[in-house]
């Protein structure tokens, strides 16, 4: 199993960091929205914006990848995602957060597309199931671990948003 993991170790580490940041942001926004006094209905709309963006991003991924390539697409979408996380602290209103969630969802689904296409392209057919099972363990483990990052500071502070953007 180790010979299978070593060549993709850096990519799996990148996935772990990406999902730590995304998982942290998802929970952080729900808590911070409550602290800001947003209604449950507003929070429902805000959080659903991620999935609207996720859907939109599926249509944007291929044209962007074809136009600028996998590496530039990855860098571009990682930068957009990081900026959108940080902007949540500056645009503290439900409409702003909804729009930022759409941007975040689009960016992340394009990042997942690039990552999974790299894994798919690297892996021989007979090993693909093993590689993607490792990928899913990293994926879900990172999302679970991300919740513990909330212990590092108050949700009302900038620190957790900065950490989410860094990851």
Regions flagged by a language model, labelled:
Residues 69, 90-95:
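Helix-breaking motifs and short loop linkers at transmembrane-helix boundaries and internal kinks
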Residues 51-59, 143-144:
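Residue-level signature of mid-helix packing/kink "hotspots" within the transmembrane helices
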Residues 57-70, 150, 154:
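Helix-to-loop junctions at the C-terminal end of transmembrane segments
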Residues 2-51:
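Helix-loop boundary and gating motifs at the non-cytosolic
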Residues 22, 103-115:
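Core transmembrane helices of Major Facilitator Superfamily
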């Amino acid at each position: 199993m180790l010979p299978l993991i070593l060549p993709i170790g850096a990519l799996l580490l990148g996935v772990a960091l990406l999902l730590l940041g995304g998982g942290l942001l998802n929970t952080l926004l729900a808590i911070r929205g409550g602290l800001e006094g947003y209604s449950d209905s507003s929070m429902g709309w805000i959080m659903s914006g991620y999935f609207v963006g996720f859907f939109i991003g599926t249509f944007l991924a291929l044209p962007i990848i074809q136009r600028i390539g996998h590496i530039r697409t990855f860098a571009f979408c990682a930068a957009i995602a990081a900026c959108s996380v940080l902007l949540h602290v500056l645009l503290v209103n439900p409409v702003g957060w909804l729009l930022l969630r759409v941007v975040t969802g689009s960016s992340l689904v394009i990042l997942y597309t690039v990552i999974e296409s790299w894994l798919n392209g690297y892996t021989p057919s007979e090993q693909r199931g093993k590689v993607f099972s490792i990928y899913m363990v990293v994926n879900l483990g990172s999302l679970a671990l991300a919740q513990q990052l909330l212990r590092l500071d108050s949700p009302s502070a900038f620190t957790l948003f900065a950490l989410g953007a860094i990851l």
